[in-house]
UniProtKB/Swiss-Prot annotation:
Gene3D superfamilies: Aconitase, domain 3. Binds 1 [4Fe-4S] cluster per subunit. The gene is leuC. It comes from Wolinella succinogenes (strain ATCC 29543 / DSM 1740 / CCUG 13145 / JCM 31913 / LMG 7466 / NCTC 11488 / FDC 602W). Belongs to the aconitase/IPM isomerase family. LeuC type 2 subfamily. This is 3-isopropylmalate dehydratase large subunit.
Amino acid sequence: MGQTLTEKIFSAHTNKQVSAGEIIESPIDMVIGNDITTPLSIRAFEESGATKLANPDGFCIVMDHFIPAKDIASANQARISRDFAKKHQLKHYFDERDMGIEHAILPEKGLVLPGDVIIGADSHTCTHGALGAFATGMGSTDLAYAMITGKNWFKVPPSIRVVFKGKLQEHVYGKDLILEIIRQIGVDGALYKALEFQGDTIEQLSMDDRFSLCNMAIEAGAKNGIIAADSITKEFLASRKSLRAEPKYYQADADALYEQTIEIDVEKLEPVIAYPFLPSNGKSISQAVKDDLKIDQAFIGSCTNGRLSDLRIAAQILKGKRVHPDVRLIITPGTQQIYKDAHQEGLIDTLLEAGALISNPTCGACLGGYMGILGDNERCVSTTNRNFVGRMGARSSEVYLANSAVAAASALKGKITDPRKL
């Protein structure tokens, strides 16, 4: 019997044929921590008596949740990671001087590669599956174990094959593909399974859209989301200044055993809006327009949709116009490099002239930490990945998940708007 893409990667790392359901211990190529989760890992690392990282070049800390510090507590917490990075002379450490959201900056820096096994103490580590890697989130103690040993244990997940067919309509993106699959299968429809994305739609999808797609695999309960590397992947890698190692390319076998195959024709797919309070509560933009949903805030950013293409989409829609007077539009570039590139393209000026607020790269608004918190009964259309009760602020606030075009168009009109109708 053939193997799925996830099984292929684990087999290569363990030097044996593995299949779904097996418990294995695998070497880790990249271990990722951030300013919130790494301090707990550092504590466990030091309490174990460890003094050296098993693989210093395969460990990365990204300060992205509360950086610059939002208060004294977060400033003190950040010092733990900073001191550890300095003590161990970490090569891959990203702070205020070269900052970015972890799941945007690692691909940008060439630190995650096809064929890798990647773990991170952040649930959206699955983003990196867009590059053809196995990538999943774990807890801080699991991270500490990998810091000490360079390995971790896994139960090889069964795979669901998701085949997207057809050409996407204007202003329908990778974000809409993942919101549609979550709408169909629910937030636990892929519980501890690999979502392997295939089809001619995927073959035409940009890397930025692939990152958005894989980013939200966890919102369906998936262990990981993954796309086989192809010419688009290779073009992306070729544009990096350097790569951590040589990529390893794998493809699923034609006779691979999948637990389920889901086929979706995207030809008639509209932009999808996930209503409160679950990412699975998806409705079409046409329905959202009928519901006449006035908004207080629009947010464009996060590890889901804070890439250069998202800023280009927003600038195209907002150019020469002004944000509705009742709406706050907050835009958070995913990395400093994205910010710089957007500035060089004139996007930042366009967005500022439209009335947007441009923040530093941060996860702050997405998790209701800072830089975009919602007050009582406020409503936000957001390009983030979660819309649980109180996710971005007050428990009575509402978050509607959407793509960047919808968020920008809605900011203009003061209510959730179909960007295709502008």
